[in-house]
Amino acid sequence: MNQSTTLARTIVRQIVEAGVTDVVISPGSRNAPLTMAFYAASERNLITIHTRIDERTAAFFALGMAKASGRPVPIICTSGTAVANYLPAVLEASHSNIPLLVITADRPAELRRTGANQTTEQARIFGKAVRYFADISGPAYPMELPFNSLQSGPVHLNVQFPEPLGADDESDWLAGITIKRPKEFDRKLPGTFYTKSTRGVLVIGHDRGGLAVDDVATFNPSYSILNQ
Protein backbone atom coordinates (compact mmCIF):
# COMPACT_ATOMS: atom_id res chain seq x y z
CA MET A 1 0.00 0.00 0.00
CA ASN A 2 1.42 3.42 -0.92
CA GLN A 3 2.06 6.11 1.69
CA SER A 4 -0.76 8.44 0.62
CA THR A 5 -3.38 5.68 0.78
CA THR A 6 -2.15 4.55 4.20
CA LEU A 7 -2.19 8.09 5.57
CA ALA A 8 -5.65 8.92 4.20
CA ARG A 9 -7.19 5.72 5.54
CA THR A 10 -5.63 6.27 8.96
CA ILE A 11 -7.14 9.76 9.16
CA VAL A 12 -10.57 8.75 7.86
CA ARG A 13 -10.82 5.75 10.16
CA GLN A 14 -10.19 7.94 13.21
CA ILE A 15 -12.75 10.48 12.03
CA VAL A 16 -15.38 7.79 11.59
CA GLU A 17 -14.54 6.14 14.92
CA ALA A 18 -14.97 9.51 16.66
CA GLY A 19 -18.62 9.53 15.61
CA VAL A 20 -18.38 12.20 12.90
CA THR A 21 -21.39 11.79 10.61
CA ASP A 22 -20.81 14.29 7.79
CA VAL A 23 -17.92 15.51 5.66
CA VAL A 24 -17.82 18.26 3.02
CA ILE A 25 -15.44 17.65 0.11
CA SER A 26 -14.38 19.97 -2.70
CA PRO A 27 -13.11 17.93 -5.69
CA GLY A 28 -9.42 18.06 -6.52
CA SER A 29 -6.39 15.98 -7.41
CA ARG A 30 -4.13 16.20 -4.36
CA ASN A 31 -6.97 15.34 -1.95
CA ALA A 32 -7.89 12.22 -3.97
CA PRO A 33 -6.59 9.80 -1.29
CA LEU A 34 -8.93 11.34 1.29
CA THR A 35 -11.84 11.46 -1.15
CA MET A 36 -11.47 7.76 -1.97
CA ALA A 37 -11.15 6.81 1.70
CA PHE A 38 -14.25 8.79 2.66
CA TYR A 39 -16.12 7.27 -0.29
CA ALA A 40 -15.30 3.78 0.97
CA ALA A 41 -16.66 4.74 4.39
CA SER A 42 -19.81 6.24 2.87
CA GLU A 43 -20.44 3.01 0.92
CA ARG A 44 -20.85 1.32 4.31
CA ASN A 45 -23.11 4.09 5.59
CA LEU A 46 -20.46 5.15 8.09
CA ILE A 47 -20.45 8.79 6.98
CA THR A 48 -22.34 11.10 4.61
CA ILE A 49 -20.40 12.97 1.92
CA HIS A 50 -21.50 16.45 0.81
CA THR A 51 -19.80 17.71 -2.36
CA ARG A 52 -19.35 21.43 -2.99
CA ILE A 53 -17.15 22.56 -5.89
CA ASP A 54 -16.43 26.04 -4.50
CA GLU A 55 -14.27 25.88 -1.37
CA ARG A 56 -15.68 29.04 0.19
CA THR A 57 -19.22 27.70 -0.20
CA ALA A 58 -18.13 24.31 1.12
CA ALA A 59 -16.59 25.83 4.25
CA PHE A 60 -19.67 27.85 5.15
CA PHE A 61 -21.93 24.88 4.44
CA ALA A 62 -19.90 22.79 6.89
CA LEU A 63 -19.84 25.68 9.36
CA GLY A 64 -23.64 25.73 9.36
CA MET A 65 -23.88 21.99 9.97
CA ALA A 66 -21.36 22.13 12.80
CA LYS A 67 -23.14 25.09 14.36
CA ALA A 68 -26.56 23.41 14.18
CA SER A 69 -25.43 20.01 15.44
CA GLY A 70 -22.62 20.92 17.81
CA ARG A 71 -20.58 18.09 16.26
CA PRO A 72 -17.30 18.41 14.32
CA VAL A 73 -17.63 18.59 10.53
CA PRO A 74 -14.52 18.04 8.39
CA ILE A 75 -13.90 20.04 5.21
CA ILE A 76 -11.51 18.65 2.60
CA CYS A 77 -9.81 20.48 -0.27
CA THR A 78 -6.89 20.16 -2.67
CA SER A 79 -3.60 22.03 -2.48
CA GLY A 80 -2.72 25.57 -3.55
CA THR A 81 -4.95 28.63 -3.57
CA ALA A 82 -8.02 26.47 -2.85
CA VAL A 83 -6.98 26.50 0.81
CA ALA A 84 -7.24 30.30 1.08
CA ASN A 85 -10.96 30.16 0.32
CA TYR A 86 -11.53 28.50 3.69
CA LEU A 87 -10.29 31.53 5.65
CA PRO A 88 -13.60 33.46 6.07
CA ALA A 89 -15.38 30.40 7.49
CA VAL A 90 -12.42 29.53 9.70
CA LEU A 91 -12.52 33.03 11.20
CA GLU A 92 -16.26 32.69 11.84
CA ALA A 93 -15.67 29.31 13.49
CA SER A 94 -12.90 30.78 15.62
CA HIS A 95 -14.97 33.69 16.91
CA SER A 96 -18.00 31.45 17.55
CA ASN A 97 -16.11 28.42 18.91
CA ILE A 98 -17.56 26.10 16.28
CA PRO A 99 -15.92 22.65 15.80
CA LEU A 100 -14.74 22.91 12.19
CA LEU A 101 -12.12 20.33 11.20
CA VAL A 102 -10.12 21.75 8.28
CA ILE A 103 -8.11 19.14 6.37
CA THR A 104 -6.09 20.52 3.48
CA ALA A 105 -4.19 18.29 1.09
CA ASP A 106 -0.68 19.44 0.24
CA ARG A 107 2.24 18.45 -1.93
CA PRO A 108 5.38 17.18 -0.17
CA ALA A 109 7.27 19.83 1.80
CA GLU A 110 10.31 19.64 -0.48
CA LEU A 111 8.24 21.20 -3.28
CA ARG A 112 7.51 24.36 -1.30
CA ARG A 113 9.16 27.56 -2.50
CA THR A 114 10.27 25.85 -5.72
CA GLY A 115 7.58 27.19 -8.05
CA ALA A 116 5.87 23.79 -8.26
CA ASN A 117 2.33 23.82 -9.64
CA GLN A 118 -0.53 24.14 -7.13
CA THR A 119 1.89 24.70 -4.27
CA THR A 120 1.83 27.53 -1.74
CA GLU A 121 2.63 28.06 1.94
CA GLN A 122 -0.28 26.20 3.51
CA ALA A 123 1.38 25.58 6.87
CA ARG A 124 -0.18 27.88 9.49
CA ILE A 125 -2.04 29.75 6.76
CA PHE A 126 -4.91 30.39 9.21
CA GLY A 127 -2.62 31.77 11.91
CA LYS A 128 -4.08 32.12 15.38
CA ALA A 129 -7.63 31.48 14.16
CA VAL A 130 -7.23 27.74 14.72
CA ARG A 131 -6.94 26.03 18.10
CA TYR A 132 -4.52 23.42 16.82
CA PHE A 133 -2.37 22.95 13.72
CA ALA A 134 -0.35 20.02 12.41
CA ASP A 135 1.70 19.62 9.24
CA ILE A 136 1.49 15.88 8.59
CA SER A 137 3.96 14.21 6.27
CA GLY A 138 3.17 10.56 6.89
CA PRO A 139 1.27 8.12 9.10
CA ALA A 140 2.62 7.71 12.61
CA TYR A 141 1.60 4.95 14.99
CA PRO A 142 -0.14 5.47 17.23
CA MET A 143 -1.69 8.45 15.46
CA GLU A 144 -4.33 10.42 17.33
CA LEU A 145 -6.31 13.29 15.84
CA PRO A 146 -6.84 16.34 18.13
CA PHE A 147 -10.59 16.05 18.66
CA ASN A 148 -10.36 17.62 22.13
CA SER A 149 -9.14 20.87 20.56
CA LEU A 150 -12.31 21.02 18.45
CA GLN A 151 -14.36 21.66 21.57
CA SER A 152 -13.23 25.29 21.51
CA GLY A 153 -13.03 26.04 17.78
CA PRO A 154 -11.49 25.09 14.43
CA VAL A 155 -8.54 22.75 13.92
CA HIS A 156 -6.29 22.64 10.84
CA LEU A 157 -4.53 19.53 9.59
CA ASN A 158 -2.31 20.10 6.55
CA VAL A 159 -1.63 16.68 5.07
CA GLN A 160 1.22 16.09 2.60
CA PHE A 161 0.36 13.47 -0.02
CA PRO A 162 3.18 12.26 -2.29
CA GLU A 163 2.42 10.51 -5.55
CA PRO A 164 1.01 8.02 -6.37
CA LEU A 165 -2.34 9.32 -5.14
CA GLY A 166 -4.55 6.44 -6.26
CA ALA A 167 -5.39 3.50 -4.02
CA ASP A 168 -3.33 0.41 -4.79
CA ASP A 169 -4.76 -1.89 -2.16
CA GLU A 170 -8.25 -3.37 -1.79
CA SER A 171 -7.93 -4.64 1.77
CA ASP A 172 -10.93 -4.37 4.08
CA TRP A 173 -9.43 -1.54 6.14
CA LEU A 174 -12.80 -0.61 7.68
CA ALA A 175 -13.33 -4.06 9.20
CA GLY A 176 -13.91 -4.12 12.93
CA ILE A 177 -14.38 -0.38 13.19
CA THR A 178 -15.92 0.82 16.48
CA ILE A 179 -17.88 4.07 16.37
CA LYS A 180 -18.09 6.19 19.51
CA ARG A 181 -21.33 8.06 19.05
CA PRO A 182 -21.49 11.23 21.17
CA LYS A 183 -24.43 11.57 23.52
CA GLU A 184 -27.21 13.52 21.85
CA PHE A 185 -28.61 16.66 23.46
CA ASP A 186 -31.58 18.70 22.27
CA ARG A 187 -30.17 22.21 21.94
CA LYS A 188 -33.69 23.70 21.98
CA LEU A 189 -34.79 22.31 25.35
CA PRO A 190 -34.04 24.31 28.52
CA GLY A 191 -31.75 22.49 30.89
CA THR A 192 -30.58 19.89 28.38
CA PHE A 193 -26.89 20.51 28.96
CA TYR A 194 -27.24 20.94 32.72
CA THR A 195 -27.17 17.15 33.18
CA LYS A 196 -23.66 16.90 31.74
CA SER A 197 -21.95 18.11 34.90
CA THR A 198 -22.62 19.08 38.48
CA ARG A 199 -21.31 22.61 37.97
CA GLY A 200 -21.29 24.81 34.91
CA VAL A 201 -21.70 28.22 33.38
CA LEU A 202 -24.92 29.54 31.87
CA VAL A 203 -24.01 31.53 28.75
CA ILE A 204 -26.61 34.03 27.53
CA GLY A 205 -25.67 35.90 24.42
CA HIS A 206 -25.59 35.89 20.65
CA ASP A 207 -27.04 32.71 19.13
CA ARG A 208 -26.26 30.42 22.04
CA GLY A 209 -28.90 27.78 21.36
CA GLY A 210 -31.98 29.65 20.21
CA LEU A 211 -33.90 29.58 23.51
CA ALA A 212 -36.77 31.99 24.03
CA VAL A 213 -36.75 34.31 27.05
CA ASP A 214 -39.56 32.29 28.67
CA ASP A 215 -37.53 29.11 28.28
CA VAL A 216 -34.56 30.68 30.02
CA ALA A 217 -36.80 31.86 32.85
CA THR A 218 -38.08 28.31 33.41
CA PHE A 219 -34.65 26.70 33.11
CA ASN A 220 -34.54 26.17 36.86
CA PRO A 221 -36.44 28.50 39.22
CA SER A 222 -34.18 27.49 42.11
CA TYR A 223 -31.33 29.60 40.75
CA SER A 224 -31.68 32.99 42.33
CA ILE A 225 -29.85 34.70 39.47
CA LEU A 226 -32.77 33.86 37.16
CA ASN A 227 -35.31 35.25 39.60
CA GLN A 228 -33.76 38.67 40.01
Give the location of each predicted region.
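N-terminal alpha/beta PP-like core and its mobile active-site loop of ThDP/TPP-dependent enzymes
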Residues: 2-228
